[in-house]
Amino acid sequence: MQDRLRILEDLNMLYIRQMALSLEDTELQRKLDHEIRMREGACKLLAACSQREQALEATKSLLVCNSRILSYMGELQRRKEAQVLGKTGRRPSDSVQPPERSPCRGRVCISDLRIPLMWKDTEYFKNKGDLHRWAVFLLLQLGEQIQDTEMVLVDRTLTDISFQNNAIFAEAGPDFELRLELYGACVEEEGALAGAPKRLATKLSSSLGRSSGKRVRASLDSAGGSGNSPILLPTPAVGGPRYHLLAHTTLTLAAVQDGFRTHDLTLTSHEENPAWLPLYGSMCCRLVAQPLCMTQPTASGTLRVQQAGELQSGTLVHGVLKGTNLFCYWRSEDADSGQEPLFTILINKETRVRAGELEQAPEWPFTLSISNRYGDDEVTNTLQVQSRDALQSWMEALWQLFLDMSQWKHCCDEVMKIETPAPRKPPQALAKQGSLYHEMAIEPLEDIAAVTDILAQREGTRLEPPPPWLAMFTDQPALRSSCSPASVPTWTQPLPWGRPRTFSLDAVPADHSLGPSRSVAPLPPQRSPQSRGFYSKSQLSTWLQSPV
């Protein structure tokens, strides 16, 4: 059965790739290939996980990849249908109609996500019962775009679930639907004993005794074959932990507000579910939207503006239409440098625009009148351009702005602030390997040399040179009986016999340095062998006179 499912899955992936190639959409094809590779890596990681937390992260990645692949499949299907309908529905005799005007796209950002919990008083206040933990995360989908939050561990000590991520969706229309899905899984192993290997079952039965061990062994064997047991929990699902959909909701343009707001959740879990959480049934978040017409200029050019009440021919300015304002600058460089405009003409949903021509002004014959009502008064500003094409471009930009304002509604009243999402925290670095001594910087103190001398004197009284008859069986020459300084071994030469000397870690020879990454103490001052207590003449003579 597993082989059949794997074959069908491979065929589906091949079909998706072929569909993407037929549409010649390199961007969508690149995204799809990336998610397929991520899915394969998540499957391999899940099979190699040994810790419960690692398996939860791998299962979360696999769930997100599957959701994105399904979303891209739906988008590919829609584009394929549109391509087929476009080829079959068009006739050579049909006249080419201009495309319908559509509202601009925008960015949607959701942040400050909070989901309150409703614990029982015996669990939260009296702290009674078993302490269970759950792993939860949010899956956010807007069109074909899917994002996820970090995995959060929840127990009864928390009053709400807090997600610190800011999810930004680009290329969103005013009719967007942002779906939020809350998934959860129990952190504790479910049915760990039921899925235990036979080796563990044998050890368990032998430790409990003959009669009790046989009953436990029979229970383990029956649970492994049938999937249930009268005394043990059911076996977990094959392939790792399983996330359950706990709640979901859908947010639209009506939920956009430049502030904190509460929304209802649709609960889909029950208390018998192992991943059940006592959700309050609502969530709090900040949902904002930025139409492109509010953040990017839609038209610009040279204008001659005659403000209301002016009797002169007007002022020559550089006009920039951005958002609901027509900014007028002295020069185009002032607009690029961000300087304050000379004056601003307001444009809102009640603004009236009228085009005309002036015969007495041959250089600026085309006019564009913008009228706004303030109370009972009506203020009209007249714009003059030099060509009909310039007049047409300004009229197109204003018509598009009116359409955007009618579709995006209150999002065009003022520019809502979108904070840049902070990067996710990288995994904690592993601790440095090595002893604590190698991580410490030891200062050169005089006490270190004194301690080294004491240790050397103690070890020197215990050391004995090798006997002379040992030279007959080894290649080492016998020790000369002369007590000259050359016959006394130094501490840098290893002795061929006896227990090796133990020196202080502070006195490390220069040719045995610990490397540049380890801090060691400087060498103690050199002293004579006699003062350090290595050997004495009395000790040597006593050794020569002692029997073998």
Curated annotation (Swiss-Prot):
Sites bearing Asymmetric dimethylarginine, chain numbering: R217
UniProt-listed GO biological process terms: actomyosin contractile ring assembly; apoptotic process; mitotic cytokinesis; regulation of apoptotic process; Rho protein signal transduction; septin ring organization; signal transduction
Superkingdom in the source lineage: Eukaryota
UniProt KW keywords: Apoptosis, Coiled coil, GTP-binding, Methylation, Nucleotide-binding, Phosphoprotein
PH domain ranges (all copies): 296-403
Domain REM-1 residue range list: 10-85
Record-linked PANTHER family: ANILLIN/RHOTEKIN RTKN, RHOTEKIN
Listed name of the protein: Rhotekin
Originating organism: Rattus norvegicus
Name of the encoding gene: Rtkn
